[in-house]
């Protein structure tokens, strides 16, 4: 099944830069775009209200917020415990302390169930392997494994689309600009781990990654846009 044959999709939507960019793109490609947001008691839970506001502003087909607070009880992380400071250093296992084990496994499973009930042919998620935070559940191999599990477990054709998988952060900004939504993504999304909308706190790892990508794009617009066109045309990692 190809994305071209799909008319109805579910977007895993946090209200951050990546998922909002995916949502904006989806609105140009599909007849029905349904957003699903997860409340797991996250440190930056302001993102839920941001997602609600953006869903209304962008006039998506529907928006559902799901309570998954059980994840907060099971997964100890800087994103689920205010008492654990967000660190720029990796833990002993080589992962950031903001990694929430099982988060995307749970999110994609629930999004798959929702897609099944809606009759949607695809889930869209903004995970990325090229310029990312080091989370293992953002990798291409993980997504393909989850897609296979959902298809087999529900006996339904279902695709997981990852528009940003092989894009770096500068190219992700370029993608928002391509749809004339750079200002909306810059000023009205929430990526910051400390819950500050727009440019954020400027200190956490998420803000650093976002800022570096924006600066790169603004300083090299033509070059980055050309590289975006090449990356989206091939759908493969760029050398």
Curated annotation (Swiss-Prot):
Record keywords, A-Z: ATP-binding, Ligase, Metal-binding, Nucleotide-binding, Queuosine biosynthesis, Zinc
Q: How is the cofactor bound?
A: Binds 1 zinc ion per subunit.
Q: Give the required cofactors.
A: Zn(2+)
Its transmembrane ranges are none
Give the GO molecular function terms. Answer: ATP binding; ligase activity, forming carbon-nitrogen bonds; zinc ion binding
List the catalytic activities from the record: 7-carboxy-7-deazaguanine + NH4(+) + ATP = 7-cyano-7-deazaguanine + ADP + phosphate + H2O + H(+)
Pathway listed: Purine metabolism; 7-cyano-7-deazaguanine biosynthesis
Q: Which residues bind ATP?
A: 13-23
Q: Which NCBIfam families match?
A: 7-cyano-7-deazaguanine synthase QueC, PRK11106.1
> Quick one: which residues bind Zn(2+)?
192, 201, 204, 207
- Pfam families on file: QueC
What protein does this entry describe?
Answer: 7-cyano-7-deazaguanine synthase
**UniProt EC number:** 6.3.4.20
